[in-house]
Amino acid sequence: MSKITKSPVLYIVLLVVGVWVAVNLFLTNAYQSIRTEEGLELIKSDSLVSVRIVDRDQRVDLELATPYKNHGTKVQFNYVSQRATEIVNAVNKAKIKDGFTDEVPAPSVWGSIISMLLPIAAIGLFLWFMAGPQAAGGRGIAQFSRMRSRLVSKEMPKVRFTDVAGADEAVEELQEIKDFLSDPDKYRKLGARIPKGVLLFGPPGTGKTLLARAVAGEAGVPFFSISGSDFVEMFVGVGASRVRDLFEQAKQNSPSIIFIDEIDAVGRRRGSGFGGGHDEREQTLNQLLVEMDGFDVKTNIILIAATNRSDVLDSALLRPGRFDRHVAIDAPNLQGRLKILQVHARTKPVSKSVDLEVLARKTPGFTGADLANVLNEAALLTARSNAQIIDDRALDEAVDRVMAGPQRRSRVMTDHEKLVTAYHEAGHALTAAAMRYSDPVTKVTILPRSRALGYTMVMPVQDRYSVTRNELLDKLAYAMGGRAAEELVFHDPTTGASNDIEKATSIARKMVTEFGLSKDLGAVKFGNAHNETLMGVGQMTARDYSEVTAERIDVQVRALIQNAHDEAWEVISNNRNLLDDLALNLLEKETLNQDEIAEIFKGVRKLPERHVWQSAPNREPSNKPPVKYSAMGPDSEVTAKSPKRTSNRRRLPSARRPRKDSETQE
């Protein structure tokens, strides 16, 4: 502020404003305003000394011989244009001592000069004020181009690698980055080149940002944290300027780490969407690519970025030499979930009777954020009940709230609706229990939650990363179990199976178009997925097959759904007594756990084994069993020797794809 007060520009502006105010005060007359009717009455009186009609302002100035009320001897009033003739006639008839004048005043020269100079001076002051941080104390336009990154200082609360659980591989990769920054000569002596960039990608809630914070806590070097959206501003060119400023700050504080969260906001593939080559984001991305190429080997600057959408990033950004290392951070496995629960349970009064491993088995597919939310919900429920210790009951309710939403106690169902819901959920549970490749049923309830009137929980015993054809067929049958029960018992199905039909149709279509599990169409991928964003729509699938093929796909999907419906009908028909028993227990208790369900289904009649999969008539399956595999641990090896290969051709590695989240049983 002292720089502003010392500048002569401020005093010049103040002088101009002062002169303008003084001139206006000088030119302002001392006439007091009165109402129009009062003015007309005064014109008719005998106390007028002089009258002046100002046509431009539609004003009449009166000078009186005696003061009028508290207004003195000089008064004025205004009139509308429609009464101009009336005013003139009244003045002509009036008895005025010095007569009257009618004038159109010329504009004031000083007023014109002041009115012209004042806006010019105001604009000049604004431009000077916004010219740069040196002239305006760092609040100018140039400040927009500066990077508002957060520099993590030593005094800030730190996260260590010990606080990160369930991502051991990612921690190992980032530990190497931290070691390089602290002892770069160790790697240079061996001719190793440390990666310039590390990309952390994975679904939301898996701990990407937490890992970056752990690097900041462990590295002991300046850590610049910024979001990808901070590069985009209202001014064109600001993004590229901020990229330059960010890397300049990092070079001045070398060795250092730059962390860009949600980099897909600025690193999206060029040419997608609107804007073309002149899009502001593309300019920012180009500058980011240039800066990453300009890294010196001895600069000791490492860029870490996190994103949920690595599939939309520009290929030039992902190539070696920029983001050399891509670290996938997926949902944790059983041991990872257990470690995460143990980390979050440190600061909460969890009962000693709680087995966190059991809780970890109940939450397959949960991310670190989901598990943290489970314990937080359990703590809130415990506090709501005025208890002091978090027990199994609170944790079970917390899991249900995270998975299916809170209970809808205000949703009151009729007795018939409860009966239909009980049979619907019993149909799901019974079909899942009678399938040979389905996961065990762990919970059934008819308590409304969120949009569902009830739900059946089917949880895998262990983590799996691929799904077999029989498992998918069991999922289809289990999904149609509720609809089959309604048809069999009430002969009048309801709309409650709409979500089940949607899920079953999605699985069946993927089996035909993505997984190659249709004998008629074979192992062919139908449909080409595009990740370009257009009008707010994310991934789109373009149809690259004919109308005839589309009809065949629909026929195969319908056949899979029909077969699943038939299997569910057969299971429920063969076990009608168990269906009635489970529905009755649900109506009495509303919620059944795994032990209670297993007791009811003790005598369930399983569905016969399906025919062996044969993709073509000429491809007879082998009767020779696979080699034996020892399941002693993750480091165990195949115990039986595999047959020797007679060919010297190099065998390519397998490219089995992990199971998507949408393929998990719900």
UniProtKB/Swiss-Prot annotation:
The keyword NADP does not apply. Residues 642-659 have a biased composition (Basic residues). One of its GO terms (cellular component) is plasma membrane. It comes from the Bacteria. Residues 29-108 are extracellular. Its EC number is 3.4.24.-. SUPFAM superfamilies: FtsH protease domain-like (SSF140990), P-loop containing nucleoside triphosphate hydrolases (SSF52540). Its main location: membrane. Its cofactor is Zn(2+). The active site is at E425. ATP binds at G202, P203, P204, G205, T206, G207, K208, T209. It is a multi-pass membrane protein. Keywords: ATP-binding, Cell membrane, Hydrolase, Membrane, Metal-binding, Metalloprotease, Nucleotide-binding, Protease, Transmembrane, Transmembrane helix, Zinc. Zn(2+) binds at H424, H428, D500. Residues 612-666 are annotated as: Disordered. It is found in: Cell membrane. Residues 1-7, 130-666 are cytoplasmic. The chain crosses the membrane at residues 8-28, 109-129. Binds 1 zinc ion per subunit. InterPro entries: AAA+_ATPase (IPR003593), AAA_lid_3 (IPR041569), ATPase_AAA_core (IPR003959), ATPase_AAA_CS (IPR003960), FtsH (IPR005936), P-loop_NTPase (IPR027417), Peptidase_M41 (IPR000642), Peptidase_M41-like (IPR037219). One of its GO terms (biological process) is protein catabolic process. In the central section; belongs to the AAA ATPase family. In the C-terminal section; belongs to the peptidase M41 family. Acts as a processive, ATP-dependent zinc metallopeptidase for both cytoplasmic and membrane proteins. Plays a role in the quality control of integral membrane proteins. Homohexamer. This is ATP-dependent zinc metalloprotease FtsH. The gene is ftsH.
